[in-house]
């Protein structure tokens, strides 16, 4: 943010959230980390706090969908039997137009800010753990190994930079877990409601309803998208939605000769689309709590999920699917 004029600050916030979420593999973690900065930036520049927090949440959904250490990516590739790096390439090409247009929209809407963003001091050293995790994931290092490496590096950087003493390592880790308590409880309650929906046949009805209406390859892809989106509405958890619909999506993709990389990408994309605009989803609940606004106020400014859906539908309709040789 040091190098950006105030008019580009909201767009810069979106880019930072994209980078952090792709490195961390978690949208909720990204929102919790950047929400305070969004609030302070709004106060300093005069930008609407809703716009600022929406930029953070939109960027968070970018990484939640794309990151190779994200649980949604892992669930999608495991259920479809493809490689993470292959899914990443295809998924990236699908959502890139949406990300670019989103950036432009945030810049245009924020143009005319009058304040100055106070970025404070920063250290390149503290960025190293994020870069290691991001690069390690991109080159295909085992997820568990790269996450453990990132955690150890973060602790080393924290101690060497004076952020905390080595004797406080476990308390710092504990504080991180404790900070997620409220949203975890809410997520558990929503998951319980989703389990009740499944137990009483709601999810099975959705699956039958969608499958009966699939007749062509394009229809199959739209059906997969609708299926995972509907299940995410019911469960408010995109990972759970992908796991629950993964097997039926694989059956449909094999029947209609759809590339597994494409199916994995569509599952992840449309689960993220819905998750990003659910007022009772963990992401918007955490964003609204951090900014002190209603989730319903944020939803109209969640440009990225909307554009991601448009981009994916255009891809389905105009890009023929053929299985990888």
Predicted regions and their residues:
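Hydrophobic transmembrane alpha-helices of multi-pass solute/ion transporters
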Residues: 1-8, 118-191, 205-209, 213-214
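Short helix-coil transition sites and intra-membrane helix breaks within transmembrane domains
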Residues: 21-33, 61-70, 182, 195-204, ...
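Alpha-helical transmembrane segments of multi-pass membrane proteins, especially transporters
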Residues: 9-17, 28-35, 51-60, 73, ...
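Hydrophobic alpha-helical transmembrane segments of multi-pass integral membrane proteins
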Residues: 5-37, 58, 210-250, 267
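C-terminal transmembrane helix pair
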Residues: 72, 79-100, 217-325
